[in-house]
Amino acid sequence: MCVGIPVQLLAVDGIRGDVIEDGRPGLVDLSLVPEARPGDWVLAFLGAAREVLTPEAAAQISAALGGLRSLMAGGDLGDAFADLEARSPQLPPHLQAALDAGKTRA
């Protein structure tokens, strides 16, 4: 499973971005998100930014990752997934469209 980490861009130099990750400085490749600017949050995986995030999305992902770290250390999730607990599960749009069209088998 791949897990992206939200990081905040401090500076942009071409396709290179200086970031803060868990309080430590780092670098990410911005080739996939050329619209990213200093101050933006991006989802990074293996040294490359994959997506520009809203501050709210970055906070939700950070909370979820923090909850998983707590769980792995023997703690509990707390409210790490509060955004999911307050709603019913949803199908991805393509599966919902198939279900709405009456398709029930693969």
UniProtKB/Swiss-Prot annotation:
Signal peptide positions (record):
none
UniProt-listed GO biological process terms: protein maturation
Matching entries from PROSITE patterns are given as: HUPF_HYPC
**Which portions of this protein are annotated as coiled-coil regions?**
none
InterPro entries from the xrefs?
Hydgase_assmbl_chp_CS, Hydrogenase_HupF/HypC
**Recorded GO MF terms:** carbon dioxide binding; iron ion binding
In terms of NCBIfam families, this protein maps to:
hypC_hupF
Q: Which family does it belong to?
A: Belongs to the HupF/HypC family.
Supply the name of the protein: Hydrogenase expression/formation protein HupF
